[in-house]
C-alpha cells in the first residue's frame, strides 16, 4: 500500500570505475537505473525519484516517465545526495521516511524494497536496513561481502551492533550478508549527514558505522536472499539473463 509520507530515492552517478556509465548500461533495451526505478514503483510504498548530478541519467529516466531531482556533483556519499534531494522535493517537510535504494540493483524484488520499512514500526529505531543469511564459506570470508553482527529480535529482525568486512561473528551459528538498502526517519537522516566521518567508518570503509558510533539505532530485517548488485561485467551479464528470463 502506498505510504504518502514515504519517499524512495535512487542516487545515480557516473563514477563507477569497473563499469563506466553503469546507470545507463543497457539491460533488455532499458537503462539499468530505469529497471531499479520500475521495481521501486512496483513496491507501491511511496513517491519515487532518481537523484543525480548527470544530465544524461536525468534524460534517460525522464524518457521512461520517471521523476528526477538534480543534485550537486560534490557529495561525498549517497546519503548526502539523498538529503539534498529530499530538501529539494519536500521543502514543506511532509515526508517522514526516506528510502535510499542503490541504482545498481536491477533485479531487486519489489517486496524486498517494502520490507525495509518494517523495523521502523518500532519508534526506537532510527534507521532500518536488510540482510540475508550467509550459506557459503566463500561469502563468509569475502571482504567485499559486508557482514552485520546483531542481537536477534524475534526470527526476522536484528538490532545491529556492528558492520564489518571481516568474517564475523566468530564460532557456530548464522552470519548475515548486509544488503545496502536503507530506510531513514527524516530526523535520523538529517542527523546522520551532519555528523563527521567516524573512525570505524573510515577504517572499514562502511558509512553506516558512523550512525552506530554516534549512538543511533539501526535494525535489520532478515530476508531470504541478497539481490544481485551490478559491479562487474559478469554481474551485468547475469542481470541481463535474469531479466530476459
From Swiss-Prot:
Gene Ontology CC: cytosol
Key word Aminoacyl-tRNA synthetase present: no
Gene Ontology biological-process annotations: CMP-keto-3-deoxy-D-manno-octulosonic acid biosynthetic process; lipopolysaccharide biosynthetic process
InterPro entries documented for this protein: Cytidylyl_trans (IPR003329), KdsB (IPR004528), Nucleotide-diphossugar_trans (IPR029044)
Pathway: Nucleotide-sugar biosynthesis; CMP-3-deoxy-D-manno-octulosonate biosynthesis; CMP-3-deoxy-D-manno-octulosonate from 3-deoxy-D-manno-octulosonate and CTP: step 1/1; Bacterial outer membrane biogenesis; lipopolysaccharide biosynthesis
Main location: cytoplasm
Subcellular location: Cytoplasm
Enzyme Commission no: 2.7.7.38
Domain of life: Bacteria
GO molecular function: 3-deoxy-manno-octulosonate cytidylyltransferase activity
UniProt keyword annotation of Nucleotide-binding present: no
Catalytic activity: 3-deoxy-alpha-D-manno-oct-2-ulosonate + CTP = CMP-3-deoxy-beta-D-manno-octulosonate + diphosphate
Biological role stated in the UniProt entry: Activates KDO (a required 8-carbon sugar) for incorporation into bacterial lipopolysaccharide in Gram-negative bacteria.
Family statement: Belongs to the KdsB family.
Name the UniProt record assigns to this protein: 3-deoxy-manno-octulosonate cytidylyltransferase
Lineage per the UniProt record: Bacteria, Pseudomonadati, Pseudomonadota, Alphaproteobacteria, Hyphomicrobiales
Amino acid at each position: 500500500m502506498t505510504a504518502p509520507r514515504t519517499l524512495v530515492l535512487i542516487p545515480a552517478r557516473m563514477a563507477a570505475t569497473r563499469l563506466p556509465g553503469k546507470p545507463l548500461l543497457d539491460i533488455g533495451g532499458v537503462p539499468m537505473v530505469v529497471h531499479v526505478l520500475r521495481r521501486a514503483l512496483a513496491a507501491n510504498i511511496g513517491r519515487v525519484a532518481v537523484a543525480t548530478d548527470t544530465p544524461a541519467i536525468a534524460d534517460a529516466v525522464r524518457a521512461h516517465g520517471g521523476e528526477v531531482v538534480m543534485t550537486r556533483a560534490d557529495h561525498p556519499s549517497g546519503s548526502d545526495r539523498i538529503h539534498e534531494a529530499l530538501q529539494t522535493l519536500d521543502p514543506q517537510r511532509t515526508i517522514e521516511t526516506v528510502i535510499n535504494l542503490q541504482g545498481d540493483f536491477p533485479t531487486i524484488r519489489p517486496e524486498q524494497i517494502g520490507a525495509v520499512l518494517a523495523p521502523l514500526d518500532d519508534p526506537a529505531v532510527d534507521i532500518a536496513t536488510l540482510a540475508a543469511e550467509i550459506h557459503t564459506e566463500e561469502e563468509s570470508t569475502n571482504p567485499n561481502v559486508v557482514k552485520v553482527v546483531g542481537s536477534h529480535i524475534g526470527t526476522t529482525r536484528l538490532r545491529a551492533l556492528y558492520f564489518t568486512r571481516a568474517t564475523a561473528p566468530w564460532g557456530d551459528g548464522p552470519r548475515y550478508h548486509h544488503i545496502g538498502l536503507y530506510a531513514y526517519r527524516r530526523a535520523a537522516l538529517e542527523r546522520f549527514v551532519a555528523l563527521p566521518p567516524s573512525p570505524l567508518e573510515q577504517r572499514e570503509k562502511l558509512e553506516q558505522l558512523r550512525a552506530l558510533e554516534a549512538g543511533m539505532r539501526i535494525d535489520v530485517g532478515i530476508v531470504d536472499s541478497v539481490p544481485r548488485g551490478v559491479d562487474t561485467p559478469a554481474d551485468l551479464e547475469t542481470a541481463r539473463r535474469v531479466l530476459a528470463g
